[in-house]
Amino acid sequence: LRELAWDFVGIEEPVSPNAFDDMRKISECTGSPIILDESCLRVDQVAALARDAERWIINVRVSKMGGLFRSLAVVQAAGQAGIPVIVGAQVGETSVLTRAALIVARAAGTNLVAQEGAFGTHLLQTDVANPVLMFGEGGILKANAYGFATASGWGLTLRPTQDFAVSLSE
C-alpha cells in the first residue's frame, strides 16, 4: 500500500473485526487510519479507541447501529474522543434511511469525513417514500433542494404498501 502513488483517506477494516492490534500495526505501517465497520457497533466501544484516536475513523450506518438515536450517540462519543466518522449506507437503502443518515451527518459536523448513500432509484426499482432522496451529478445529494427545514416531520411521505406487492412468480 505504501508503494501506491496516492494517500488514502483510510483503509476499511483490513483484517477480522476486533483485531485492533493488527489494525494498529497496519495503520502505523501505512500512515492511514483504519475505518472501523463491524468493530464499532455501539457507543460503549468508542472510549477504548480514544487513546490513539488518530488511528481510527468510525463508519456509522444507521441500520447497523440499530437506529437513529444509537447512531447519534456514537457520533457524539466519537466527536468527544477526537475520532472522525463516515456516515455510511447499506446497498439498497431507501429514502427513509437516507433521511436518517442526513440527520446523523449534520450532527457529526466538522467531524464528518465522508458520507455514502442516497442511491434511491439508481439502485432500487422503486422507493418507499416521496420525494426519492437521490444523488445527482457528481454524486452530490442536494439536501437543501428538498425543503426539509420547513417540512413537517422528516419531510417524506410514505407510499401506499400496495405499490410494493411482489409476485412470487417473478
Locate predicted features.
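Catalytic core of soluble alpha/beta enzymes
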Residues: 1-100, 125-126
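Flexible C-terminal active-site loop/helix
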Residues: 91-170
